[in-house]
Amino acid sequence: MNVFLLSAAVVLFSIGVMHSVVAEWTGERRLVWRITQLTLFDSSHAKDLLAKRIARLAWHLTSLIWCGTAAVLAYIAFVEASESIIVIVRILSVVFLLHAALSLAIVRGKHGSWLSFLIVSVCSALGTMAF
């Protein structure tokens, strides 16, 4: 068992669940709701209603892809590594390093997601060395 990859999977799955579940009570109401309340949107107009639904869909699809990626990392943590698996995990490590960097830069450190994504990235990278 690769503890680093399993750790990355647990952190990433937690991010995904928190992003969707907690967002239903706080984040979506505080962020997505505000965006959809801008005067750009007219709730009586069908296209604006569709835009609101798409914003909400994108929010939850993001959570779904993180949970799916966590499942892949958890699976890989329990199988024998091949060269292909190592390359895939290294790619994921870079992707989550970019998640961390963009989150840190764009929100200027005011949202803690950058640290969680950095943990996923580092654990994934270390996981490729532990095979």
Question: How does the language model describe each region?
Answer:
Residues W25-I54:
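Cytosolic, membrane-interface loops and tails of multi-pass inner-membrane proteins
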Residues V79-A81, L98-S116, L126-F131:
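Membrane-helix boundary connector in multi-pass membrane proteins
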Residues A70-I76, V94-S103:
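Transmembrane alpha-helical segments of integral membrane proteins
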Residues S14, T36, L98, S121-T128:
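Alpha-helical transmembrane segments and their membrane-interface exit regions
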Residues W59-L73, F117-S121:
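Core segments of transmembrane alpha-helices
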Residues N2-T26:
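N-terminal signal-anchor transmembrane alpha helix
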Residues A81-V94:
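Structural signature of hydrophobic alpha-helical transmembrane segments
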Residues V3, V17, R29-V32, S121-L126:
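Polytopic alpha-helical membrane-helix bundles and their juxtamembrane interface segments
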